[in-house]
């Protein structure tokens, strides 16, 4: 008993030293971020997101470590259920009041697209006919479809906000349940749920667009399904369904799914698991194909179907920044082409290729490096490479860009089953993380908010390894 106590004290002392080191690294790192922000190298949102994640993660670990004695006390299932329901109800009421009475601070691009598209559709004849935006970003159109449906159902965007707030609260509870499944500690799960609710309330009217709210539930749902008690076959089928649905709502849902497969790679090396793996990927393909068919039918009903015969100039016109109140990245003056309802292929090739080159020249040295790194990685994010779709090799670039990403992810997953050395395995994870970041590019700042549950779960796992035996 004494030896065990001595080991625990030694572990606590080690944890204290590590926490002090983290604090020493944390403050200069944040100062560096804000200096870079003031110099224009990074966006304000990047600093806020990184700062919030580090602060909340370190704060969570510290609180759990500080109150570990009370946290380790058993908690009845009845009290646990009541506590989670209480957190859910109180947070939902508070966030609903915020949605109803606080002015909207972050206008979603998709809402602006919808409103402006309806407005411009009234004078469709003067709009340039492009078919870029929703051809290249079909998953974003899913957001427009969902928001449009909710808007028609409730009659205002307040109703849309309340529905997305409900999804955020459900995500928080799932984060708590997942933490309980991993750590086996109900008190830790309640703490995680509360912290997640506090963070989501802070972000509700500032840095969390509707698309993130709608997509947030899927990553944590995948983790919850994986950690819950269920037969392995049913588990992978449910995960495949969650990934398929989440992919249509928010494409980045696929990232935690791949991460989960990689982290669990050692467990899937055995031959008897091949059946489960095959069933899982087959289910994912079936669900994805079915949802893709349904999705295309919905787009046809909404007259957003995209092929060589149908144009959506007003949608693209807004997406590229004309009359865009957000002041987003697509702020190009389209007046040159506005008087040509049907510009030739040569006209738009020259115009947008020239704009892309001009944009690169105007960027700083750091910006150019990031641009070319993104170009090499064929990232999907909000970079100027998107405008290169209009050059004569647009289809080739699109195919290379997409399939390079899928090929890289496939190789990473396959590597999971081959590499057994932990050092190389962690290197593989690091490479995967870099590719994932380049894939998200500058848009990744706000998408990181979707993965706060994953951060909390990992924090819970660390606590379990350190203190809970």
PLM feature segments, named:
Residues 1-97, 276-285:
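Start-transfer (signal-anchor) and selected internal transmembrane alpha helices
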Residues 43-53, 159, 370-437:
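Membrane-interface anchor segments at the N-terminal boundary of transmembrane helices
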Residues 102-118, 122-146, 154, 158, ...:
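Extracytoplasmic catalytic/substrate-binding loops of multi-pass membrane glycan-assembly enzymes
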Residues 137, 141-145, 153-170, 190, ...:
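Loop-to-helix entry region of an early transmembrane alpha helix in multi-pass inner-membrane enzymes
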Residues 138, 159-167, 191-226, 249-256, ...:
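Multi-pass, polyprenyl lipid-linked donor-dependent membrane glycosyltransferases
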Residues 162-183, 221, 410-414:
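Transmembrane-helix motifs of polytopic, lipid-linked glycan transferases
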Residues 175-198, 424-428:
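Transmembrane-helix signature of polytopic, membrane-embedded enzymes
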Residues 297-385:
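Membrane-proximal stem/loop segments at transmembrane-domain junctions that anchor or position
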């Amino acid at each position: 008993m004494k030896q065990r106590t001595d080991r625990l004290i030694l572990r606590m002392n080690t944890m204290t030293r590590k926490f002090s080191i983290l604090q020493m690294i944390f403050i200069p790192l944040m100062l560096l971020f804000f200096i870079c922000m003031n110099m224009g190298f990074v966006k304000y949102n990047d600093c806020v997101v990184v700062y919030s994640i580090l602060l909340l993660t370190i704060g969570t670990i510290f609180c759990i470590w500080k109150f570990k004695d009370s946290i380790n006390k058993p908690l009845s299932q009845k009290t646990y259920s009541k506590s989670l329901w209480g957190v859910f109800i109180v947070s939902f009421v508070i966030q609903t009041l915020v949605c109803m009475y606080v002015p909207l601070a972050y206008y979603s691009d998709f809402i602006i697209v919808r409103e402006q598209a309806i407005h411009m559709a009234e004078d469709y004849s003067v709009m340039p006919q492009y078919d870029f935006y929703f051809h290249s970003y079909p998953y974003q159109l899913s957001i427009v479809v969902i928001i449009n449906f909710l808007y028609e159902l409730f009659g205002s965007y307040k109703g849309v906000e309340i529905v997305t707030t409900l999804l955020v609260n459900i995500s928080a509870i799932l984060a708590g349940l997942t933490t309980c499944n991993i750590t086996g500690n109900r008190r830790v799960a309640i703490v995680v749920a509360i912290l997640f609710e506090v963070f989501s309330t802070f972000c509700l009217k500032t840095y969390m667009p509707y698309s993130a709210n709608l997509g947030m539930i899927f990553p944590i749902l995948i983790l919850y399904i994986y950690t819950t008690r269920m037969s392995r076959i049913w588990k992978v089928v449910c995960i495949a369904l969650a990934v398929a649905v989440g992919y249509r709502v928010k494409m980045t849902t696929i990232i935690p799914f791949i991460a989960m497969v990689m982290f669990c790679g050692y467990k899937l090396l055995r031959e008897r698991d091949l059946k489960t793996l095959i069933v899982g990927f087959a289910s994912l393909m079936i669900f994805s194909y079915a949802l893709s068919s349904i999705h295309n039918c919905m787009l046809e009903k909404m007259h957003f179907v995209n092929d060589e015969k149908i144009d959506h100039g007003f949608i693209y016109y807004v997406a590229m920044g004309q009359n865009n109140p957000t002041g987003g990245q697509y702020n190009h003056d389209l007046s040159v082409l506005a008087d040509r309802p049907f510009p030739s292929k040569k006209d738009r090739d020259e115009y947008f290729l020239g704009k892309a080159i001009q944009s690169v020249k105007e960027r700083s040295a750091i910006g150019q490096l990031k641009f070319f790194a993104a170009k090499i990685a064929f990232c999907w994010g909000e970079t100027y490479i998107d405008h290169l779709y209009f050059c004569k090799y647009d289809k080739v670039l699109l195919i290379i860009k997409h399939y390079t990403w899928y090929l890289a992810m496939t190789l990473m997953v396959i590597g999971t089953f081959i590499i057994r050395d932990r050092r190389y395995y962690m290197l593989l994870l690091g490479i995967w993380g870099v590719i994932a970041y380049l894939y998200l590019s500058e848009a990744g700042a706000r998408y990181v908010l979707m993965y706060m549950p994953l951060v909390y779960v990992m924090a819970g796992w660390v606590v379990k390894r350190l203190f809970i035996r």
